[in-house]
Amino acid sequence: MDMSSANFESVVRGHHIYKSIWNPAVGERLDVSIERDNAHDRYAVSVQRDSVIVGHVPREVAKVFKAFITHGGEVACEVTGRRKRGNGLEVPCVYHFKGKDKIIVGIMQLLKLTTANKMYS
C-alpha cells in the first residue's frame, strides 16, 4: 500500500504547564504520541521533546489523532511561531501526518469536519 503525507495547522496546548522545561523554537520538530496513562482524558495525545511531555494536541482533535496513530500512522509536530494566549498558552505548529493513502484521506476529512464543527458551535 502506498504511503502519503499531509499537514494540519494547529497549536500545542498547555505550554503554561510546561514552560519551565520547554522554550519553543520556530522550526523545532517534536514527537507526538498517545498518552495512555492520562487520568483526565482517555483520548490525550502528547507532544514530546526528547521523550518528555511539553504539551498536548488540542482536545477537539485528539480523538482523531489517536485513531490515526492507533491505525499505524505517524505524526510529528513542527513549531511555526511564538507562544500566544488562547486556551492557556499555546504554541502555533503544523502537525505532519504520514501513513497509508486511504487513512490519510480519511483523517484529513475528519479533521476538517471536526474543526468546522468547532467554529459553528
Task: Give a label for each model feature.
Residues M1-S121:
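Conserved active-site motif detector
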